[in-house]
């Protein structure tokens, strides 16, 4: 009964430590923002800088006091397929003395850029459920405040396949007191059919001037309904803008936005009124999007709550976007930052570069991801072939070669993150479009950075070994050969042999034994083993630290999230989590083995490393990754139990499930209680509370299986992957059986007594694989934990089987390198 009580105490200890760490993180998450916002702030109406108030003309004050009950009207001038690079290109042609046919367009582009410099220019992410956003999709999304499709995936963007709604959530949220007027037939997808609601009694106006004559609070104009080229769109937008500036009511707030990107997916032009504010302030002269956490970037779904907030003074939680705060009136030339010509040009150039960066990331992410996974698979195949019963004279050379290649490939995930600090996306770019060479440059640069990471880790390992050398010389520890000889002299079945202490048995751990005999410290690790461990640890360290500071390197990364896909803009993405978790499992198991094993070590290492990773990944103000937290808690519990040599019964699995729900629920509560708009974790908690989460879960489930149902090529690829995985598992089971029977062609990799290399193929009866050190259990435990991680990650994340590929890419090289380096150091 005593060992069973120890098991129960250990399990309770693991649970208490994890819960304590999560509670501490929650307290910090709540108290931190509260302390940061404790300083008194001016009311929203007084938040404008004093320089703005001093520069307001007297007419603005008169206009604002003219009618306190009626907000200043808002005019939305919409176009499509227009980027900052397009405007800069047309304006540069005008400056270069282009032909007279394009001179008018160049002047129009100049005027639009000047208008943007006086306002708040931004990039607009217009992603909808499809890979490209048709104009009809954009209008329907604007009306619903959620991503929506008006055009079937296989249809063209010529016209909507969805019926025009009678009313829309946008019009309903505005209420009956806010009148709406539109120009262009496509706008009905955003506002509903004429007469469908009390505030839409009039039909679609035939022209901008007639719409302005109606003096509605909200006027939405489709300026690109008759345009098909950049020049035509720019000219039409400029004409509509001039008309609004001349004929609209004083103080009218003007929004310019390109809503669709069906020609070249990527961030679009958006200009908000000067003085527009965000809860996240500004950065580099650009408004930080509240939903994106990125400077100068907002989403199409943010426009809907922004309009409702500006005109109706309310915020509807049914909308997915986050509202920006428009100024009370339109004040031309008064922005939240310096609007000099040089500053305005710098802001526009930065936005154009950010859009180019996003497009280059989208073009690179599939190639870089496939390369990373392919290299991991190739490494495993090469290692299996090269290390299979080689000649005795080549064994050590092959071992070292495979080990260092694995160490190098283990550095690639970190390198692909760090390479984003250099402007690789600008190589060969032209007219706002990335070059095909940019992807190659990113990969080559990452290869060089990976070499630097390995070199740095090797230098640190050499320094550590040099510092430890005098101490080890003063009190030498037993050599690995002596340890192996001592293990070999124990009779088979002795209680001191590892075979008698199998994983199913529960015996006191090395650091808990009551034997009076002195325990031996683990032999010093060689430089290769320490280098491999450091390179593997760099993966979770780099990606999690980057996520904690806002993901400046992961956003628009060759491997990460970008503004084109627009699935996530901050925190820990699915790709980042797969890389982090895969490497983290290997690192925790490797560190535990270095510390000599034992239950206390398992608890300590998992609680510190795993708990820290869980806090960063799940905290709403850091990683905000609900799927990652759901995956990490059971995986860490399984890993701890495996390292501590404990058996998880179904009751303990139920307890782990309850703890997982508790941890994720705690993160959601923190998200809802902290100041500002909640992240998607908090919104999902609200949806669970009001019963609308079924739709979200359905969409995620479809995202998991949909590609394999609708695309035959994806189904064929999945079938091939299943066959390959099944073959690999069959081969692995055969090798494990041969290893246990002493007939494995890889038996020479095992540490042996007196440093002798056994013969393979069953010709040597006393195989060393029967008497390996208990520390060898860490490899088996890590493999099983990676299996749990992969299974749960695939099921709870909408990236699906892609998660398995990135887990393999991060874990396989690291695990192989540590295993081979460890066996070399033990010889």
Model-derived features: positions:
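Soluble extramembrane regions of membrane proteins in the secretory/endomembrane system
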Residues: 36-51, 55-361
């Amino acid at each position: 009964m005593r060992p069973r009580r120890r098991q129960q105490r250990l399990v309770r200890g693991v649970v208490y430590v994890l819960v304590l760490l999560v509670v501490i993180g929650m307290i910090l998450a709540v108290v931190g923002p509260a302390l940061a916002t404790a300083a008194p702030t001016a009311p929203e109406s007084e938040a404008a800088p004093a320089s703005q108030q001093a520069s307001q003309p007297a007419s603005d004050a008169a206009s604002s006091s003219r009618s306190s009950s009626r907000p200043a009207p808002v005019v939305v001038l919409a176009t499509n397929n227009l980027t900052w690079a397009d405007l800069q290109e047309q304006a540069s042609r005008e400056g270069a003395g282009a032909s007279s046919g394009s001179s008018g367009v160049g002047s129009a582009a100049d005027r639009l850029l000047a208008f943007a410099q006086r306002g708040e220019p931004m990039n607009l992410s217009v992603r909808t459920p499809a890979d490209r956003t048709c104009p009809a999709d954009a209008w329907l999304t604007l009306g619903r405040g959620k991503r929506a499709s008006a055009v079937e995936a296989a249809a063209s963007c010529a016209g909507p396949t969805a019926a025009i709604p009678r009313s829309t959530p946008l019009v309903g949220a505005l209420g009956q007191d806010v009148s709406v007027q539109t120009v262009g037939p496509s706008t009905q997808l955003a506002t509903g059919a004429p007469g469908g609601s009390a505030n839409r009694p009039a039909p679609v106006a035939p022209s901008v001037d007639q719409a302005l004559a109606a003096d509605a609070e909200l006027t939405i104009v489709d300026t690109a309904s008759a345009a098909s080229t950049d020049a035509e769109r720019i000219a039409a937008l400029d004409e509509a803008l001039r008309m609004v500036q001349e004929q609209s009511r004083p103080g009218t707030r003007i929004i310019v936005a390109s809503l669709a990107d069906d020609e070249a997916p990527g961030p679009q032009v958006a200009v908000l009124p000067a003085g527009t504010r965000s809860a996240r302030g500004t950065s580099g002269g650009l408004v930080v999007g509240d939903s994106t956490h990125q400077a100068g970037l907002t989403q199409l779904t943010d426009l809907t709550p922004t309009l409702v907030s500006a005109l109706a003074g309310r915020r509807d939680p049914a909308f997915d976007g986050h509202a920006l705060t428009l100024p009370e009136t339109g004040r031309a030339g008064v922005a939240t930052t310096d609007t000099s010509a040089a500053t305005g040009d710098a802001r526009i150039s930065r936005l154009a570069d950010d859009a180019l960066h996003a497009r280059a990331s989208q073009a690179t992410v599939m190639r870089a991801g496939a390369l990373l996974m392919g290299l991991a698979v190739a490494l495993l195949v090469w290692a299996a072939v090269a290390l299979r019963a080689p000649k005795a004279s080549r064994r050590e050379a092959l071992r070292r070669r495979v080990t260092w290649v694995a160490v190098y490939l283990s550095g690639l995930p970190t390198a692909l993150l760090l390479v984003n600090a250099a402007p690789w996306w600008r190589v060969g770019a032209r007219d706002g479009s990335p070059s095909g060479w940019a992807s190659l440059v990113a990969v080559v640069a990452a290869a060089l950075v990976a070499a630097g990471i390995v070199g740095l880790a090797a230098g640190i390992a050499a320094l550590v070994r040099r510092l430890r050398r005098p101490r080890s010389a003063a009190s030498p520890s037993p050599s690995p050969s002596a340890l192996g000889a001592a293990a070999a002299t124990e009779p088979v079945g002795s209680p001191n042999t590892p075979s008698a202490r199998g994983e199913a048995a529960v015996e006191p751990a090395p650091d808990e034994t009551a034997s009076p005999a002195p325990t031996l410290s683990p032999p010093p690790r060689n430089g290769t083993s320490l280098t491999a461990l450091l390179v593997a640890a760099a993966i979770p360290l780099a990606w999690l630290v980057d996520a904690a500071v806002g993901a400046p390197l992961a956003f628009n990364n060759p491997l990460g999230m970008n503004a084109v896909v627009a699935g996530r803009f901050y925190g820990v993405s699915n790709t980042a989590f797969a890389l982090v978790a895969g490497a983290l499992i290997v690192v925790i198991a490797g560190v535990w083995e270095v510390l000599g094993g034992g239950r206390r070590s398992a608890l300590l290492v998992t609680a510190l490393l795993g708990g820290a990773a869980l806090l960063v990944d799940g905290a709403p103000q850091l990683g905000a990754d609900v799927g990652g937290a759901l995956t990490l808690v059971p995986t860490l519990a399984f890993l701890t139990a495996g390292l501590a040599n404990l058996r998880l019964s179904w009751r303990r699995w139920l307890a782990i499930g309850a703890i997982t729900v508790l941890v994720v629920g705690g993160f959601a509560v923190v998200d809802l209680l902290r100041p500002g708009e909640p992240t998607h974790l908090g919104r999902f908690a609200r949806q669970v509370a009001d019963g609308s989460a079924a739709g979200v879960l359905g969409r995620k489930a479809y995202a998991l299986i949909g590609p394999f149902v609708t695309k035959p090529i994806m189904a064929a690829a999945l079938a091939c992957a299943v066959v390959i995985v099944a073959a690999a598992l069959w081969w692995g089971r055969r090798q494990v059986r041969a290893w246990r029977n002493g007939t494995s062609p890889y038996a020479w990799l095992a540490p042996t007594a007196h440093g002798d290399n056994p013969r393979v193929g069953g010709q040597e009866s006393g195989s060393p694989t029967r008497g390996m050190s208990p520390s060898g259990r860490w490899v088996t435990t890590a493999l099983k934990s990676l299996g749990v991680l992969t299974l749960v990650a695939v099921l709870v994340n909408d990236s699906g089987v892609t998660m398995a590929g990135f887990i393999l890419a991060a874990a396989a090289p690291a695990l192989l390198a540590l295993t081979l380096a460890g066996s070399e150091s033990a010889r």
